[in-house]
Design a protein with these regions (language model features):
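Long, C-terminal-biased catalytic regions of enzyme "large/alpha" subunits
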Residues: 1-400
Length: 400
């Protein structure tokens, strides 16, 4: 374990010394708790930099998908992966590649048409012509196929799709370079960019060694665990073609793909999950424009359960259990009969029922504001001091 010194920017003197491992763990925990970008590994970032002769990559945008030279920018576009699954769960590779090709061309056109916030950003963006094509709803695809998000098969599938997207985008960029010429900054960086392309090619073939000028070896494509051999074969062939075309014509764009969080556009695109992320909650509360909320379940849950072999009846029961019935009538455990046995009259039960649609948790319904303080103290026998405790749980008090 080594110490890490923090130095003052004013005079470069040591301000504090911290254990490096402890500091790393604190940063990792903070990134995990906040779900915001954490540490950026500068060495690896610059080892895969396509234009190192034009300067180092020093930072990223706030969401951390775009890493390139200072004073550059890229337009973003994302594809909804779920739209490429057919009814049998087979991924439509040719349609996906067509969409990637079409959007790569569209984004290239947008470089010329875009407006930038400063002269420097405009000039450098025209010079390097970076693009930002990505995808969303990976979690939805995995759910639809009944695959655990944290599994070797899921990682292999995600790696294959990403390799196909990036390889196809760079291949399209090389084809555009044949017609339009390479980006202006390519000549100064040709050998380095081709080196990066060859490293991508090796990774797509699942090769574990032989990489060029990398400080840390990458995790190559897991060919054996990919559930669809057509995906890995396509990833390999498209990267072979990309490298060959790049040798002949160069590339129209210094970068072509990023994977953004898609927190906003993912909703517009009707995605069940955003970016590469799993679903943060299978059941969510949707706020209504006229007031109030209603519960919705991820639409992929029934499809995932069917893929896992559950019968239609079992799927229906599981969905009802997850979403809830919206009423205590006939519910297991906490129902009208059980409440009447505890002293609840019909008026109190009606007040509970009226509060259920807006409740995020059933515990939030059982409180003195819904039932009335007098009812809680005189009928249910709850001491006033107990009722005023911040962590008081009425359901536990009632024996549920």
């Amino acid at each position: 374990q080594k110490d890490w010194t923090l130095r003052r920017r004013t005079d470069n003197e040591v301000a504090k010394t911290l254990p490096a491992t402890q500091l790393r763990d604190q940063m990792a925990t903070a990134a995990w708790q906040s779900a915001d970008p954490g540490v950026q590994f500068e060495t690896t970032i610059n080892d895969w930099h396509t234009c190192p002769n034009s300067g180092r990559i020093r930072a990223s945008n706030p969401c951390s998908e775009y890493m390139f030279l200072d004073d550059t920018a890229c337009n973003l576009a994302s594809l909804n992966l779920l739209q490429f699954l057919d009814k049998n769960g087979k991924f439509d590779i040719s349609s996906f590649q067509h969409a990637v090709r079409l959007w790569t061309i569209t984004l290239e056109i947008s470089v010329l048409m875009a407006q930038f916030p400063s002269r420097e950003i405009a000039q450098r963006s025209y010079q390097f012509r970076t693009l930002g094509l990505g995808y969303a709803n990976l979690g939805g695809v995995l759910m639809a196929k009944g695959m655990p998000y944290d599994s070797e098969e899921a990682r292999a599938l995600a790696g294959s799709l990403t390799a196909i997207m990036t390889g196809t985008a760079y291949r399209t960029s090389a084809e555009m370079a044949e017609e339009m010429g390479a980006f202006p900054g390519y000549a100064d960086n040709a050998s380095e960019m081709l080196r990066v392309m060859r490293n991508h090619q090796r990774a797509a073939h699942g090769i574990v060694e032989g990489y060029e000028k990398l400080s840390v070896l990458p995790t190559p494509l897991d060919i054996d665990n990919c559930p669809d051999p057509d995906l890995t074969e396509t990833a390999q062939s498209v990267w072979d073609e990309t490298v060959e075309l790049g040798k002949k014509y160069g590339f129209r764009n210094a970068q072509t793909t990023v994977i953004a969080p898609t927190g906003t556009i993912g909703l517009v695109m009707d995605c069940d999950t955003t970016g590469v992320e799993p679903d943060f909650a299978l059941v969510k509360f949707k706020k209504l424009a006229g007031g109030g909320y209603f519960k919705i379940i991820n639409r992929m849950v029934p499809k995932a359960l069917t893929s896992l072999g559950y019968s239609d009846q079992h799927v229906k029961e599981i969905v009802n259990y997850a979403v809830g019935l919206g009423t205590l009538a006939g519910a297991p455990k906490i129902n009208h009969d059980a409440l009447q046995n505890k002293g609840f009259d019909l008026d109190a039960i009606s007040r509970l029922e009226a509060s259920l649609p807006d409740a995020f948790d059933i515990r939030f319904v059982f409180n003195r504001w819904t039932l009335g303080e007098e009812f809680c103290i005189e009928v249910l026998g709850i001491p006033e001091a107990k009722l005023n405790e911040p962590d008081f749980d009425m359901l536990t008090w009632l024996g549920f």
